[in-house]
A protein has these predicted regions:
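Sensor-1/coupling segment of RecA-like P-loop NTPase cores
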Residues: 38, 136-141, 146-182
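Conserved adenine-nucleotide phosphate-binding loops and their immediately adjacent elements
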Residues: 1-29, 95-101, 192, 197
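Conserved nucleotide-binding/hydrolysis micro-motifs of P-loop NTPases
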Residues: 70-73, 136, 165-168, 188-189
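P-loop (Walker A) phosphate-binding loop of NTP-binding proteins
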Residues: 43
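Loop-to-helix "switch" segment enriched in basic
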Residues: 2, 120, 175-176, 180-185, ...
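Conserved small helical "lid"/interfacial subdomain of P-loop NTPases
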Residues: 185-211
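Generic structural signal for small/hydrophobic residues in well-ordered secondary structure
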Residues: 22, 49, 82, 132, ...
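Conserved phosphate-binding/catalytic loops and adjacent sensor/switch elements of nucleotide-binding enzymes
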Residues: 46, 50-127, 134-138
Length: 265
């Protein structure tokens, strides 16, 4: 009997309340579709999934999403979920491949990928596949499968990999051909104008320019830091005092960082 697949892994996470559409990044992601791969790598709290989820919602191209976890280090499970995510866009893409991926004993997972690659190669329109939280699935076997997919990537497919760490896959050749869009921490940090729009438009805090500049400097544009500061500021009567005291040792920031550390253990 085939192991059931969790359907919720096949949908982009809902955007946070009052999430801001970051037009600068939306435009870069649109332009990245001209290449084969978009690689979004940054530590926790940089809003990677939020940015990509917002972009996918507005993307005119059919888009498949797969949220990965530690269980997907099993190459057969990875291949099964990869197939299911593509089937969520077009059932014919995974026609027969899902049964192969879930068969026990089954063929090597590369066989499943070959089936998918061949079906994708016959597709007329472009398709986007997003692999979120790739760091959880990363390992020698799954990295080899991803490298195989990239090496044999059919023209209609644009692949987006979201990870806290740079995947151990060979990308030099694609980069030399201008086929990779790289988005890292510096790209994902809030620019000064984005900070202003987030605090005073999305969060409706009504801060002065000096207050915004001070908070931007203290968080260094870190999206999670700004989010935590904004939530706390909404409950403060003295914004200036709070901003002066807000650092990485602030209670909410400590809770966030502690949770991230525990999740890595």
């Amino acid at each position: 009997m085939a192991t059931p697949l969790l359907a919720t892994k096949l949908f982009a996470p809902p955007p946070p309340l009052r999430a801001m559409k970051r037009q600068r990044l939306m435009q870069r992601l649109d332009a990245g579709l001209e290449g084969k791969l978009t690689l979004v790598c940054a530590p926790a709290g940089f809003g990677k999934s939020t940015v990509l989820g917002t972009w996918v919602q507005a993307c005119e191209q059919p888009s498949a999403w797969l949220s990965l976890d530690e269980g997907d280090r099993d190459p057969n499970q990875f291949a099964a979920y990869l197939t299911a995510s593509l089937r969520s866009v077009s059932a014919d893409l995974g026609d027969g491949a899902l049964a192969l991926a879930q068969a026990r004993p089954g063929p090597p997972p590369e066989t499943v990928l070959i089936h998918l690659i061949n079906r994708l190669a016959m597709r007329r329109g472009r398709l986007v596949l997003v692999l979120d939280d790739y760091q959880f699935a990363s390992g020698p076997e799954v990295d080899a499968l991803l490298a195989f997919l990239i090496d044999n990537q059919p023209a209609p497919l644009h692949l987006i990999v979201i990870s806290r760490e740079v995947p151990a896959i060979p990308l030099a050749r694609l980069r030399s051909r201008g086929q990779v869009l790289d988005l890292g921490p510096q790209d994902l940090r809030f620019a000064a104008e984005e900070t202003r729009l987030f605090l005073n438009q999305s969060m409706a805090l009504g801060l002065t320019d000096p207050q915004i500049q001070a908070l931007d400097a203290r968080t260094e544009g870190w999206p999670a830091g700004l989010q935590m500061a904004a939530v706390s500021l909404a409950r403060q009567s003295d914004a200036d005092s709070f901003i002066r005291s807000f650092t990485g040792s602030h209670g909410l920031a400590q809770d966030y960082l502690l949770e991230e550390v525990l999740n890595r253990l």
